[in-house]
Amino acid sequence: MAFDDKMKPVNGQPDQKSCGKKPKGLHLLSSTWWCPAAVTLAILCLVLSVTLIVQQTQLLQVSDLLKQYQANLTQQDHILEGQMSAQKKAENASQESKRELKEQIDTLTWKLNEKSKEQEKLLQQNQNLQEALQRAVNASEESKWELKEQIDILNWKLNGISKEQKELLQQNQNLQEALQKAEKYSEESQRELKEQIDTLSWKLNEKSKEQEELLQQNQNLQEALQRAANSSGPCPQDWIWHKENCYLFHGPFNWEKSRENCLSLDAQLLQISTTDDLNFVLQATSHSTSPFWMGLHRKNPNHPWLWENGSPLSFQFFRTRGVSLQMYSSGTCAYIQGGVVFAENCILTAFSICQKKANLLLTQ
């Protein structure tokens, strides 16, 4: 603009001095090439302006693209974060599922071990029955044959259970190996593992029922064996002979009624005088979880424990447990249950064990 203003007096106004002599300092403007130079300069300025505008527009577009790209990156980050969170939850759920499966397998393994122990006890009792069968006196050949046949059947059933338990142990081992490979398995394979565990649990329950039936048969065999051995022995029928005494397991009554029942049979409630007596009673009651009255009682906690014959209790064999310090109007009486002697109110109902001397002359 300043350059054009300087040009106005030269182009538009008459210069009085131009007639006589050339003006000083403006000899360049009066040359013939300044006009093309100005046009060229104006074009360059215009081109630069257009270039700047185009570049600014491109910069804005690039900025918008960068913002859109940044938004896409943020959205992808959120998606990736959600996917990672979902994957982590799935892994946690898988770990929890595997932990539950392992706990179930540990529980089943423990149950199998318990059943194996019970089976060993049954086998030992069966062996004792076989030995007692050989020592049975004055038993008829037919009775012995029937008992032996029943024992053979019991052995066969026990062997069958043993084989099935081995199969269950093998299945359990296979489940444990499958659990170690659970990370490679899909949800379908885990469902199959759970179904196998459910099937194994059902089989265990069935075997438990069968063992309970075998226990009952074993008890019946013991009672039948004792009856066969005592049919003409030193004890009356249905009584169990051991050393110098005969024993009878009687129905459930309170302590006083049980004592009267034993007296009516010319006997008394159980009295333990030796360690051998205690071991015999513990073995005879091991098959049952029911309580059995003994001939031991006292009127109140300040009185000593006395047997029916008036002799005091010797604590070298056992000690009583339970509420022995509590006072009852009917007194406190002792019963044996699960190999432990307890003290309780005499008015309660329990089974009883009658005891009397054996007629050893019949064995000579």
Curated annotation (Swiss-Prot):
Has UniProt tagged this entry with the keyword Glycoprotein?
Answer: yes
Q: Which UniProt keywords apply?
A: Cell adhesion, Cell membrane, Coiled coil, Disulfide bond, Glycoprotein, Immunity, Inflammatory response, Lectin, Lipoprotein, Membrane, Palmitate, Receptor, Repeat, Secreted, Signal-anchor, Transmembrane, Transmembrane helix
**Subcellular location as annotated:** Cell membrane; Membrane raft; Secreted
Residue positions with a glycan: 72, 92, 138
The alphabetized list of GO BP terms reads: immune system process; inflammatory response; leukocyte cell-cell adhesion; lipoprotein metabolic process; negative regulation of miRNA transcription; positive regulation of superoxide anion generation; response to hydrogen peroxide; vasoconstriction
Q: Which SUPFAM superfamilies match?
A: C-type lectin-like
One GO cellular component term of this record is:
extracellular region
Report the induction information. Answer: By hypertension. Up-regulated by shear stress, lipopolysaccharide and TNF-alpha in cultured vascular endothelial cells.
Which ranges make up the Cytoplasmic topological domains here? 1-31
PROSITE patterns with a match to the protein in the record:
C_TYPE_LECTIN_2
Q: What does this protein do?
A: Receptor that mediates the recognition, internalization and degradation of oxidatively modified low density lipoprotein (oxLDL) by vascular endothelial cells. OxLDL is a marker of atherosclerosis that induces vascular endothelial cell activation and dysfunction, resulting in pro-inflammatory responses, pro-oxidative conditions and apoptosis.
Domain observations: The cytoplasmic region is required for subcellular sorting on the cell surface. The C-type lectin domain mediates the recognition and binding of oxLDL.
Subunit details for this protein? Homodimer; disulfide-linked. May form a hexamer composed of 3 homodimers. Interacts with HSP70.
**Name used for this protein in its record:** Oxidized low-density lipoprotein receptor 1
Q: To which species is this protein native?
A: Rattus norvegicus
Instruction: Cite the source lineage.
Output: Eukaryota, Metazoa, Chordata, Craniata, Vertebrata
Report which gene this protein is encoded by.
Answer: Olr1
